[in-house]
Design a protein with these regions (language model features):
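C-terminal functional module detector
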Residues: 1-169
Length: 169
């Protein structure tokens, strides 16, 4: 109920603010907030990217790869452990993504359908209130027209198809 969740295909992701606010929580900040990020993986899973999404959007300044920041990534169980500073101009929700763009899950998943998936984990948002008046969403729909009212599964699939998102039948 508190929204303190991660979604993962294997990597174990921990994200919290320097004040200990976890996913689903509300943090207060001035113009920046520090996120403590830790990713652990078994030996057969590799990650090579940490991306912070601000209000659902990626930023090149918050994209950390093994190639651009090699000393930030480990080869043992702990693949990444770092405090990341995020500069903000407005209230925001923050999601951290850990991803293995050069890896798959074949070693652990064998020949199952899931074996070709990439290692990926992300947290539920941490909401950040900058001015102390409560969190205000910015209203960005990320380019998707959001329907109002109830729609059927068929209508939802049609909307996703129009947006270029592939759906299963």
């Amino acid at each position: 109920k508190a929204g303190q969740m991660i979604l993962t295909t294997g990597p174990y992701l921990e994200v919290e603010t320097s004040d200990g606010i976890l996913a689903g929580g509300l943090a207060r900040a001035n113009h920046s907030i520090d996120l403590r990020v830790r990713v652990q993986c078994p030996s057969w899973i590799e990650i090579d990217r940490i991306q912070v999404l601000v209000n659902g959007r990626p930023s090149e300044a918050l994209n950390y790869t093994r190639e651009t920041h090699p000393s930030w990534f480990g080869d043992g169980v702990v693949k990444f452990e770092r405090s990341l500073s995020v500069e903000l101009e407005e209230d925001a929700h923050l999601i951290v993504v850990a991803y293995g763009s050069e890896s798959d899950l074949r070693l652990g998943y064998g020949s199952s359908d899931q074996s070709s998936n990439r290692p990926c984990a992300y947290n539920n948002p941490i909401f950040v209130d900058l001015n102390g008046d409560g969190f205000t969403p910015n209203g960005d729909t990320l380019g998707f027209a959001l329907p109002s009212g109830r729609i059927s599964v068929k209508e939802a699939k049609e909307l996703l198809s129009e947006a270029g998102v592939e759906t299963s039948e």
